[in-house]
Amino acid sequence: MSLNPQRTYVHHSEDGVATEVPGGEEFWSQPEAEMGRYGEGWLVSEFAFESDWPNWEMHPNADEFAYLLSGSVEVHLERPEGLQRVALKGSGAVVVPRGIWHTAKVAAPSRMLHITRGAGTEQRPA
């Protein structure tokens, strides 16, 4: 069965079971107690961006794989040695190391696929 990863995310549990979960705003507006059940394992999600990310985020428990499907973005990584900018255009990917704050500047409407462990994710305004 086909699914739209912008509207339906996939959660891969520690035991290898993949479960479809409502995506988009429905996912992110869940109460924190509900979100907790997705903290273990890996979340696969797709996002469409027309403007810069409104926040920085950091995943303390695992690296994140961020894959640009289309468009143009510059991913900013706040590394101990200073800000690193990674330009992605058309297609490309970046691995964001665990514990590294990151955001993206959007140069053209873009779609990105993200694979990460959500537990403990922190956010702050951009």
PLM region spans:
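A short beta-loop-beta micro-motif enriched in histidine and acidic residues
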Residues: 51-65, 81-82
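Double-stranded beta-helix
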Residues: 1-13, 18-21, 103-126
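A short, N-terminal "cap"/entry segment at the start of jelly-roll beta-barrel domains
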Residues: 1-56
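Short beta-strand segments in beta-sandwich/barrel cores
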Residues: 54, 71-77, 93-94
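Short acidic-glycine-tyrosine-enriched beta hairpin
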Residues: 80-98
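Short, conserved beta-strand element in jelly-roll/cupin
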Residues: 60-75, 115
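A generic "binding-loop/recognition-motif" signal
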Residues: 61, 100, 108
